[in-house]
């Protein structure tokens, strides 16, 4: 479990980051990352995982993901819906190629950033659900 968790997390981040180019996105990548949390839960006990994961941190992560998504949605509405604000900046100065399958990471405008916000929300939400189910199954109650 200790050797696989890094690969699962990196693959989940890859799925989140490239969701606008390939099948995937924030929800799918978040679910992949939470499958790593489930693997840790199976390999170790729920009490061990409860020591390292706090409910408050998961709540803050989930709320932050929703807030970031809403802010980016309104920022995109300010100019053109999902306007690619990265074009013309010193780092990404060239105009990206258009058309399906261009393969350039920065052609998605706000969509990759919104995928990260959705991924953050899904990771926190599903982790909370999985940990609550594990603690309930072990006979321990949550401290809410």
What name fits each language-model region?
Residues 1-8, 49-74:
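Interfacial and helix-entry/exit segments of alpha-helical transmembrane bundles
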Residues 130-144:
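Cytoplasmic juxtamembrane regions at transmembrane-helix boundaries
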Residues 102-127:
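Hydrophobic alpha-helical transmembrane segments
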Residues 43-56, 107-111:
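A cytosolic-side transmembrane-helix exit/cap motif
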Residues 2-21:
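Short, hydrophobic/aliphatic alpha-helical segments
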Residues 33-42:
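Alpha-helical transmembrane segments and their membrane-interface exit regions
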């Amino acid at each position: 479990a200790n050797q696989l968790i890094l690969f699962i997390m990196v693959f989940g981040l890859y799925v989140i980051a490239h969701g606008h180019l390939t099948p995937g996105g924030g929800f799918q990548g978040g679910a992949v990352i939470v499958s790593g949390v489930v693997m840790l839960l199976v390999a170790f006990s729920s009490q061990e995982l409860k020591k390292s994961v706090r409910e408050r941190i998961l709540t803050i992560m989930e709320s932050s993901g929703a807030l970031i998504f809403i802010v980016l949605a309104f920022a995109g509405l300010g100019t053109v819906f999902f306007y690619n604000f990265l074009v013309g900046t010193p780092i990404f100065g060239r105009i990206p190629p258009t058309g399906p399958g261009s393969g350039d990471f920065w052609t998605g405008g706000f969509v990759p950033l919104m995928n990260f916000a959705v991924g953050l929300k899904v990771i926190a939400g599903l982790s909370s659900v999985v940990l609550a189910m594990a603690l309930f199954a072990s006979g321990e109650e949550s401290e809410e």
